[in-house]
């Protein structure tokens, strides 16, 4: 649970507890929950950390208002619509020196200079931008629009860095059939036209490569995939793309009848696929070299236990075919991971950590990419014969490319720094650590912990060497 959600829930629980002494009628129990209190639904810091913003439902209204509060407390002030143009939003990404921050507001990219407070609007488009970040050298702001990635420079120029297409490469030569070879050999006109076409394409490509003002050509992943997501390295050298098989059976969505409607007629709401009817679609991860548009599938075979079937005995009892090859995997999306990201780059763009989950939910791996060999090398495996928790899977990089992660390997969620067997547990004991936030220098970790008893959560702090909890 994130800090904002936790504090909002706490407020609601406290309000409920304070009213527990008063008998509650059935009418009140079934009434709109505004009488309990309206909790804070989300909260975030301004880019300069001098104030806090939060959103709260207005009593008796579906509208959510945004408020600001000084970092030292005091009286909260509601932000009027006219002041939204200067508002910092959540999800800020900072440059290496932490002098600038970028964020998304209303689908557009903004940059805040922490020195003088200047706010620069980078995009104003009908499409939604996402995932803003600074390039490794700090000279560009990178962001995503749909399946494509763009770079903005201080000159105001926005250029495409990576255009991803789930299509066949139109310039890729198809295999020459025997009939085609026969025609080209016998009909000189066809052979000449083919040679001229290839010469024109080669000249076009060479001019495009030589012209620094020209946009990069698109990267084609083939017509048999559907793009599910992607990430671009801060140095702009690599990208990774998540795909599923095109045409794969996702299962029939359920139809939920609604009988109480404004129209007076029954209506149907489309809901998720019924549990057990179809497994989630297996995913693949592709390594793209941006400069050359070369695409390689990432090899997962080095993950321990990837080819071991934890359901082998059940398959045998049911007289089903045994598992052949590797287990089906997913690169967990943020919704499935309780809001935690699933692919994290080091600040210099030289390392990428990825979270992979078996579709049978018995294993979760954290791995680092071997770029030269297009392989994922396991850093940490969490395995359970029952079920791997959706929560407590946060991970990332600290300054100096130090790796950190949460794991329930001890039975409780704890914070670790380091790779594999060299990882050091910063926290331990009969409590859980969650919602980790590091300071900019990577020397202090702040997190939720419940050391006193399971329902009593506090904000805890610990040094990166494990001291000072």
Where are these regions (language model features)?
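Beta-propeller folds
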Residues: 8-12, 20-469
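Bacterial N-terminal signal peptides that target proteins for export
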Residues: 1-8
